[in-house]
Every structure is written in structure tokens, then in C-alpha cells.
Amino acid sequence: MAATGINSEDRLVQATFAAHLKDKLGWDTVYAFNAETFGADGTLGRNDTTEAVLTRDVRAALRRLNPELPTPAIDDALRALTLHDFSRSLLQHNQEFARLIRNGIPVSWRDANGQRRDARARVIDFDNARDANRFLAVRELKLTGLPTPNYNRRADLVCFVNGLPLVFIELKAVYKNIRAGFDGNLRDYMDENVVAQAFHHNVFLIVSNGDRAKY
């Protein structure tokens, strides 16, 4: 959804989705629009609206899932998961991040004896998914373009797993054609000059009007 007024019926569908994630699936939920505070201790830990990854949650997950890794290795893994290369396309970013999420992030460091150590840092626990990961759904997340900072968009519902935006949900009022959500909104968001960084880690795109859904 672009940064304009929110139709009350659109908001009803959005609130219903968020309530289901919270009450039925155990997700944490946050309503961010005009309520988010920024900084390390802010609502989501973001420094500003160009950040699509919640680095505070990513760092916490890396530490939790890789207790044997020293801080420099954790820092390297976090950088690898948030690197934005303007010479690469959205698809290239997505493919690379998918490999890192699935296979682990290669890291190396020197131990106390000066010996090189190599490992792969996990950012998601696929074996104990429910208990070992943090699931957070954010409503009305404001995003600003990286190459063009004057492009501002407001995402209806973004679902984060350990701080990574894996699911992007565009919601419409029940009487609206869900195709419009893809053609009129998602295509715009994914433009390299708009907020493509929000889709670098994406696994699912969902459009729904509360009655029907496509992904």
C-alpha cells in the first residue's frame, strides 16, 4: 500500500490476518505506522525506514543459534545477510540470501592459539522451528527506497523470522479484486528504484482480500 490514507475495510482485513497469526499461530505482532520509534532500543531496532531487515533480531538469533562463535564471526555473518550490492538485481540478491539462509553463512576467525577456524552460522533453526525462532508480523511497515530515498511505501503486513522479512502480504478489502494488489502494489514495490530491498530475503508473496488469497 502506498503512503496514503488506509481504507477502513482494508484495515479490517489486515487486523484479522494479524490476529490469526497471533492467536492461532503464536506470532508476535506490532502495528508500526506512526508508532514506530527508531534506534537500537526502538520498536523494531531499525535506524531508519530504509532498513528492511531487523538487524537486532538477526544478531540475537545468530548468537542464540551459534553460541560457539566469537563476536567478530557473528558480525561477519550479519554483514553477509544484510549486504546490498547496487550492481546486482533483486533476483540475484534473493538467490544468494536463500543459499545463506538454507546452508548457513560461511565465517572464519582465529582462535586463542592463532589457528584459523571455519564454520557456517545458522540464522534459522529448521529442526526446532517453533521454539528456537522468533516470528514477528509487522503491520503498516514504512519503507524508503535505497537508490531513490524520496520513494516511500507502506507495507500492509510483513512477516519476519529472526529478523528476516520472509513473507510479504498485500491486503485488500473483501470487495476488491486481489489481482489489483499484485499489479497495482507489489509490482511497484519490487521495482529496483522503489523498495526492492524488502524482497531480497523473500520466500512468499501473498495477496488477499480476506476471502480469497494468491501466493
Language model features by range: what are they?
Residues M1-Y215:
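An alpha-helical interface "stripe"
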